[in-house]
Amino acid sequence: MMFKECEVLVVGAGPAGSAAATAAAEGGAETLLIDRKKEIGTPVQCGEVVGETLLKKLNLKLPPGAQAAKLDHTRFMLDRRVQLTSREPYWKAVTLERKIFDKAL
């Protein structure tokens, strides 16, 4: 078993864990990010659609091949009887290839 000292240990290399580890490292903390999976981004669980507004707020640039599709609207569905579609600029989004996106984080 290998031991490594760090100031911040982040468990889980999904988007949230990767973002937390990046923020800690950029803040000067000696950071270690670990994940139980051998390959980051697989198998994909969910969360392939991300709002363009969020990407801009987080100053995230999509790596080549990470954007699968661009969406000009978002549709919220409670069930087949209740649906809400918004084409407001705030709700524009992209569908991600998580295998590529997660590794780039």
Predicted stretch roles:
Residues 76-105:
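Conserved N-terminal helical subregion
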Residues 1-5, 24:
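Extreme N-terminus of proteins, especially the signal/transit-peptide cleavage junction
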Residues 64-74, 78-81:
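Glycine-rich active-site loop/strand segments that organize a redox cofactor
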Residues 5, 37-61:
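Conserved N-terminal glycine-rich FAD pyrophosphate-binding loop of Rossmann-like flavoproteins
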Residues 17-18:
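N-terminal Rossmann-fold NAD(P) dinucleotide-binding loop
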Residues 60-65, 90-91:
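Short, P/G- and charge-enriched loop/turn segments at secondary-structure junctions
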Residues 9, 13, 22-45:
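Glycine-rich FAD pyrophosphate-binding loop
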